[in-house]
């Protein structure tokens, strides 16, 4: 027997928890990956700036700077994993193109503690329990001219953010990330309930333009990973799988 869930949609994409998609806590996950790479002999340089880049026939010449030293490094292949910050794009003055076929959007996001939970039943209809706890999956709140995501991790902290269409939110677009977030949350009762006691773990961040496409995505001895080459919207993002697939193709 089907139950009418009003305006809620649940998608059971994974058959069980063992093989389910995972929401990674990036600080721990990235630290784990760095540790694995170092065990394999990779030289890891933290807090490093690349001040210049020169393409050559047999590699890429980099001028790098750390807190302690400056040096020149030559790489046979340079892979850009900087995402929207466009590391190689900035060094080689490669232009970002606007995606003409999709809405122009901006975003604010951060991590929070003290976010209220979503009950495992439909609060609007007062019906029985849902087939699984909503916060075992990614939560997407659809709002006028945008959407809000909420990802709760095992330790209770929440990754949350809003993607907003510029033409719908032009009046607040240039405000601080905190002001934009408050404006969006306070306009929607459910978001206000969830975040009224939430505390950001660090200052919220703003992405001035979410969607983009780089005019060049590879060269003789360099290449951009998908998130550096272009992006549409987090709602359409595959996350790690597309990145891992690209790395696998580069390796073989």
Enumerate the language-model features and the residues they cover:
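FAD/FMN-dependent oxidoreductases across multiple families
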Residues: 144-148, 154, 168-252
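Conserved aromatic-histidine-acidic binding/catalytic patches
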Residues: 21, 25, 138, 235-242
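Short glycine-enriched, charge-decorated loop/helix-capping segments at active-site entrances
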Residues: 18-19, 95-96, 167, 239-241
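Acidic side chains
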Residues: 21, 30, 80-82, 136, ...
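Conserved N-terminal/central alpha/beta ligand/cofactor-binding core
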Residues: 1-52
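Glycine-rich, flexible loop/turn motifs
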Residues: 20, 69, 108, 213-214, ...
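Predominantly flavin-linked oxidoreductase catalytic cores and closely associated redox partners
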Residues: 25, 35-192, 247
